């Protein structure tokens, strides 16, 4: 909320925002306060999909990678703001690191995991299985470029730019089939 004089405004009414944990608790706590008050959520950057993420996120602290320590903090923060089955505190964990995703899912069983890196960055349905709980829930898979610009991919080029919507629909249908198939075959 933004206070202007005696009036309070809601400039954006998003349900979740992404938060960088490297400011520490005093940088995250204001967001947790909003989670509690408004039943909104945050996704905390834990293990991102970009190739250089390991420069910091994989650093060892007392024999453990930093991303695991951040994952534990996400789980602790999440206990403060539980929804029906999942916490309002989720995590960003890249599809390009499925083994780390498996470890982090165990650390954060009640957190939604936002999974970038599917499609354009190389993540495939089989890579995503560790991010989901055993019931097939708990992960939100993102594929921005793979969907928005599907018509630029060889597979969907026949649609052309003028039919980008149809190309995007086909890409989404293929993505659903890929992920669903991988989850069924786990």
Where are these regions (language model features)?
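C-terminal helical cap(s) of enzyme catalytic domains, especially alpha/beta-barrels
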Residues: 128-134, 149-186
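A general structural detector for well-ordered alpha-helical segments in enzyme core domains, enriched
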Residues: 31, 70, 100, 104, ...
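Conserved anion-binding
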Residues: 1-90
